[in-house]
Regions:
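Canonical P-loop GTPase G-domain recognition
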Residues: 1-34, 38-43
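C-terminal effector/interaction modules appended to NTPase cores
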Residues: 45-222
Length: 222
């Protein structure tokens, strides 16, 4: 039943493994609906000829951005319009994920690394309390007394572990709520609080803005 149907299983009328793999529906991994552009760098040339240029560089996390789109800068909430979009030095009209682009706006808005450009009627959630499933890769066990760094997109904030909800047994998928000792390669569900708000989406809808890296500041391990 891998490539051809087996005569040793007359009771099985389903498809072969190969047929299933060829026909199974795989949803796209690109979210083209929710416009999210985390700002990585603000470009301000020092040359006199370009002194008035202010560009916001980064990689599009999701959604489609077009010249003329009305946007909102987060977390400030200031509104503007996309004036130009560049890939390198080439000007384009439309940008898709995961393109790395530079955007200019019609208004001189104060944006910096870690901020986000989105749509006014479709914004990410601003939260400090996170409920997440993690895979711990550090040599030292997860320690609730340690102030870990959350790297989310282009922003980094300090955080504290509020609760280890359970550890997942990878052999049985049993959720062990009594075992809160999280060591290397363990998978666990945790609650944590960040020092400042993060702009997030549900992971099932947006893998980029719905995920983060938890870093041990003493070793830089995750």
């Amino acid at each position: 039943n891998v490539v051809d149907a087996s005569t040793n299983m007359p009771w099985y009328n389903g498809s072969t493994l190969l047929q299933h793999l060829e026909e199974v529906h795989v949803s796209g991994d690109r979210n083209l609906q929710d416009c999210r552009f985390p700002v990585q760098y603000v470009i301000r040339p020092q040359l006199d000829a370009s002194r008035d240029f202010r560009g916001y560089a980064g990689r599009i996390a999701s959604g489609v951005f077009k010249v003329g789109d009305e946007i909102v800068a987060l977390p400030s909430g200031m509104k503007s319009t996309v004036s130009k979009i560049f890939v390198g030095e080439q000007s384009i009209d439309v940008a898709y994920p995961p393109q790395s682009v530079t955007m200019t706006l019609t208004d001189d808005i104060d944006l910096s690394r870690g901020d986000m450009i989105a749509r006014e009627n479709n914004q990410p959630d601003s939260v400090q309390e996170l409920d997440a499933q993690i895979c711990w890769m550090g040599e030292q066990p997860l320690n609730s007394a340690t102030r870990y760094i959350v790297r989310h997109g282009t922003s980094e904030v300090k955080s504290m572990i509020r609760e280890v909800m359970y550890k997942l047994d990878i052999n049985t998928l049993h959720r062990d709520e009594s075992d809160t000792n999280i060591g290397m390669n363990d998978i666990a569900r945790i609650k944590l609080r960040t020092a400042s708000p993060l702009l997030v989406d549900d992971y099932r809808r947006n893998r980029t803005t719905g995920s983060f890296v938890l870093i041990d500041p003493s070793s830089n391990l995750t």
